[in-house]
Amino acid sequence: MDKNKMSKFAHITKVHPCFNEKIHDKVGRVHLPVAPRCNIACKFCRRSLGKEACEHRPGVALSVLKPEDVESYLNKVLKEIPNIKVVGIAGPGDSLFNKETFETLKIIDEKFPNLIKCLSTNGLLLNKYYKKLADLNVKTVTVTVNAIDPEILKEIVEWVYYDKKVHYGIEGAKILIENQIDGIKKAYDEDLIIKINTVLIPEINMNHVVDIAKELKDFVYIQNIIPLIPLYKMSHLRPPTCEELKKVREECEKYIPQFRACGQCRADAVGLIKERKILEEFFKEKNKKLNVFELKHFSH
């Protein structure tokens, strides 16, 4: 990325714990789990909602938060954890595939204008919604890019739901890659700050991750390479060793700065890494039944 543009973003990235390692353990963030539905089927992804969702990883949330509860929930969070600077939407599905995401962002923009607005997405719909995100004053967007070669990506993503149709295998992979790259470039031109997350899967994309960095280096502020958590249809695969992770990050760092302090957080994460109970307490205090949905109601 151009150094002048990086400097332009400094006032935001210096206080965003997922873009700046130096303040990762000092500045808090809150994830609002308002987006349950997803439009792609990653073979390593198993979303969990409800009381059984006790794991601390992406795709997991105790509950789906409704937009009408966002204001009171954020008021509680900010009262208890005043070092919160960033509010993000990271699932448990794909943010851009859920209308509740945009309803929530509008509420935040009106009621909490001083919070940095952030979201995570698989990027399939980014080229459709990048301008809407900018208009809602979203500042940072994280896009998960696991391959830019369809032959590799088809081993990671089983299907893609796009344009009212399910696309399997290489067909779906091609659509996803094309939309991701197009969306990232358009978001960059709109002055959105882009981070890419890449899941390192040794037996599938380890020798390919550097190609992602080369391809996107002019449009991405930072890259976050995270180890595979062997789940779902990749439960038989191994995660990378520390040495493998280190080596791939060093190779990619020649092209894009690397983020090395990721906690692979839940969709309802709040505060610093250790602070995880606010959402449950919030619903108990409201004497309200948890708004939990069965995953069968949503596409993967």
From Swiss-Prot:
EC number(s) per entry: 4.-.-.-
Occurrences of domain Radical SAM core (ranges): 24-266
Residues binding [4Fe-4S] cluster 2: 262, 265
Gene3D superfamilies listed in its UniProt record: Aldolase class I
Biological processes annotated in GO: nitrogen fixation
Co-factor binding details: Binds 3 [4Fe-4S] clusters per monomer. One cluster is coordinated with 3 cysteines and an exchangeable S-adenosyl-L-methionine. The two others probably act as substrate.
Cofactor: [4Fe-4S] cluster
Residues reported in the UniProt entry to bind [4Fe-4S] cluster 1: 38, 42, 45
UniProt entry tagged with the keyword Iron-sulfur: yes
Metal-binding keyword on record: yes
Keywords for this protein: 4Fe-4S, Iron, Iron-sulfur, Lyase, Metal-binding, Nitrogen fixation, S-adenosyl-L-methionine
Enzyme class (EC, first level): lyase
Pathway linked to the protein: Cofactor biosynthesis; Fe-Mo cofactor biosynthesis
Similarity comment: family membership: Belongs to the radical SAM superfamily. NifB family.
Oligomeric and partner information: Monomer.
Protein name: FeMo cofactor biosynthesis protein NifB
Species whose genome carries this gene: Methanocaldococcus jannaschii (strain ATCC 43067 / DSM 2661 / JAL-1 / JCM 10045 / NBRC 100440) (Methanococcus jannaschii)
